Amino acid sequence: MSQSTRARTSNFARTLLRFLLVWVVDAISLLLTATLYAGISFAGIAGVPVIVQAFAATFLLSIVNLLIRPLILLLARPLGFIAVFIIGFLVNGAALLITSFLLPTFEVSGWISAIVGGLVFAAINVFLTGIAEANDDGSFYQGVIERLARRRSFTNIDPQTRGLVLMEIDGLSYHHLKKALADGLMPSLEYLMDNEGYVLSHVDCGIPSQTSACQAGIMFGDNTDIPAFRWYDKDKRKLYVSGNDATELNGRYANGNGLMRGGSSINNMLNGDADKSLLTLAGMFDGDAEEKKRRAEDVYLLMLNPYFLTRTIIFLFVDVVREVWQGWQQRRRDIYPRLNRLAHGYPFVRAITTVFMRDIAANLTILDIIRGAPTIYVTWPGYDEVAHHSGPWTGDAFKVLKTYDSTIARVYRTIRDKAPRPYDLIILSDHGQSFGPTFKQRYGISLKEFIEQLLPQGITVAQSMGGDTGVISLNAASGELSNIRDSGVGGIGGQVIAERGQRVLDNMVQEQESSDGTPEADKPAQVTAYGSGNLAQVYFDLLPRKISLNELNQAYPAMVDTLVSHEGIGIVCGYEDDGTPVVLGKSGRRNLHTGALTGEDPLLMYAPDAPDAFGHASLETRAWQVRRVMDFPHAGDLMVISTVYPDGTVAALEELIGNHGGLGGEQTDAFLFHPADMRITQTRNSADVFHILNDHRDLPLSETPREPADREDTADDWSLGNLWSGIKDVSSWMPLLARALVFDRLAYVEIAKSGKMTGPALLIGCVFAALAGGLRTASGLDTRAIFGNVAWWFVGVLAILVAGRLLNRSSGASYTQTMRAVGFAQAGNIIGLAGLIPPLAPLALFASTVYTFCT
């Protein structure tokens, strides 16, 4: 069988499997709708179970929808996506009425019942589809959207070189990802490790460990003079806030050689010289009318799928409820530390970052993969946002991380099945997150209040911390809605909704920023502390330049020494009279230019020796990182970093219990999850990651395919956790099942080698062996025949293994590997279902026997 024929056959099998899965979900949804809503019902027929009637009704409903969906798009598309959404629900009601007319046992009592029933059916269907992890791949609307997207393909597609798809999980540390993998929360990544030879590598992002500095480093190879997320420029007398000033920062580093040159930036702060940017703060309101219209049309394309919009809205509100529930559980159990998770509309901010931005960004990424963009960089901020408020080690954070695994799997399948060029999929983080009660929670006082106590009465102090949170995504979404409105895309209704949505998002941004304590322009302060996480840049207005420690001591005697001596302060960095930066600790002092030490090295707590320690790095690396920031022209007069406590936690200087921006703990422990042939060099700043990725970009295809390392079976393959984790990961084993059904030999090799396939193989083998036993029973339900057939199946697996060993003594296959392959092969018994129709029974038995022989 040729490769193209195999691909077409495999696609057909996948389509068939998807149809069967959707059919089952639709039947259950319709049955539940009839149970919950009186306007829809099934008339009882003697000897015909209601579930059979539900399957018949949904089959007819799918045919009706298939015929009228093109009409929906034809009529509604010129009116905008809101018209598609509304007309879609009206047509759902019409489809239910038509189905009730064609199938007398299915009853719908009028138009109102049809429309309301359609809404109930859609809501239940979305919920069940989410549980089954059945996405829109292969659906009618997705097919239309992808065909329209290809009309704007990238022109620089080279099928002989590798493209890059870079998926950033904001704020996920190397250590937290290792735990997620160990707990079976990321089966897609485990699949890539087992079958594609992927490797997880540690990256030190340096300081400041926050998004603007890290993305500038990763995307441009330069993040000079970004001393914190917020900082003050004494020369310009301007407060810089990375999110608000992303366009200026991007222009500082852009030179045409960024990582995404010629490619696409999706949901980022900076754009890496991308030709096309969406949901990216840098250049959000710049660009010509053509570029803005192209962005608006991409978002509009997604909205043509009413099910996508429905699902996203429903799951957004589900996540709001989940956050309220999790916050209540945290309070009920008196878990400490904790925050007020209802303040400033946080549940909605969380839902937008975890659900809305995830789904929108993932679908935009898929469109650009189909178009052949040379490099695509997309960020998901959901984990970072939840970890900030719940804590990075909590179940809340890991649960939301698990939801992103299916998104990774979907992008991987798109690369494998639909991309016009080869891609390397790389998962990475910009920085990690550290954990602990905040400075104020520990000591009952903020850094601002503590500094005020050390200054003469009348000296005003202001503090503005944070901002590297979900606010970035709110601003990005607001900007794209503004662009849709200004570009005239989406119809009148769509533009009205875009304007209202933008207003809501802008209000949410203002609410969030009001909690940051940004100094008001008409109330200048003499001392200001800016930054994020456990790092603050402190500026004094005594002089329009950097102020030395001696000058500060003369103006405010004992202030610096008292600051250093506080239990919660780890180091205070300042300047000698000649501008040389120094680090002050409780028991020592370090000259950052010469390395000269007095007493104990104050950086020691930030450089643990153990290779697996949180924040592991050499003293030389930490000294280089701190010196580099202090040498920035616009670093503060003082740089304050909180201490690392004996339990490994840190104290954020802002009110977030999961934090990043400075040193200590996991916040500098970023990661790269990459193909084995990617060369990883030592890193001490995110700018080093640029060179690693850029060197891998546009590489010619390898003449030999990558082979995953052979994997030995372990007892863990049969653990209940592994079995259940594999079974739940439908998005991984369903494509393999489709390929196995069409005799794809490579699929069977992947199945046999993957420990995650043990559970699915056991399920498929037992279910279809039982099915075969039941179908061979002439009358009634013979449980002995069913269980006997399952038992004989296990014996048959052993017989196949023994025969294979006798025929090929070099075979290294184990019983478990053989069981996996034979288990998936059992799916061919699905043909036997046709035997339930008496006239087709002999043909079904013959076809099933032939298929079993072929496998």
Where do the model's predicted regions map?
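A long, amphipathic alpha-helix that forms part
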Residues: 355-356, 360, 368, 376, ...
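Selected alpha-helical membrane-embedding segments in polytopic membrane proteins
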Residues: 2, 22-28, 722-813
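Alpha-helical transmembrane segments with an aromatic anchor "belt"
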Residues: 42-56, 60, 81-82, 780-837
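Active-site neighborhoods of enzymes that stabilize oxyanions during catalysis
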Residues: 239, 243-252, 262, 266-273, ...
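Active-site-proximal N-terminal segment of extracellular/periplasmic enzymes that hydrolyze or transfer
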Residues: 140-197, 441-442
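Short, structured active-site-proximal loop/turn typified by the sulfatase FGly-forming signature C/S-X-P-X-R
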Residues: 179-216, 221-225
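Metal-dependent active-site segment of extracytoplasmic phospho-/sulfohydrolases and closely related
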Residues: 406-446, 581-584, 639-641
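His/Asp/Glu-rich, glycine-adjacent segments
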Residues: 137-139, 221-374, 379-391, 494, ...
